Amino acid sequence: MQEEDEGRIERRLRAPLSAGHHSVIEHAAFTFSIEGISRASSHQLVRHRIASFSQQSQRYVKMENADYVMPESIGRDEEAASRYRELMDRIWEEYRFLSERVPKEDARYVLPNACVTNITVTMNARELW
């Protein structure tokens, strides 16, 4: 394998890109994981479809703990934060109750957009451009 200096690599990329030939950077692909975001955030991310996404399933992954994201604006208000935590705990209590009696894909309907999720993203360099 021949090694090339960074300047030469940059020139090789800059020429076709400056001529509008962006397909050359579609061959470099990146896969990364985004962890601990809310489902509300993940839905905003995937709705634009600039990449391939695999999101943690609420159907096949047990949602045993009240694992959720609290928006900063709620966290700054002590009473609002307290009520938010109480509500999340209550939602999980009801989810656990339902998941013992109905299929998990039906029980998950009560889970909020605040649920923590993980998502794997794969995209090429052009999508990151």
Model-derived regions, located:
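Family-specific signature for flavin-dependent thymidylate synthase
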Residues: 1-129
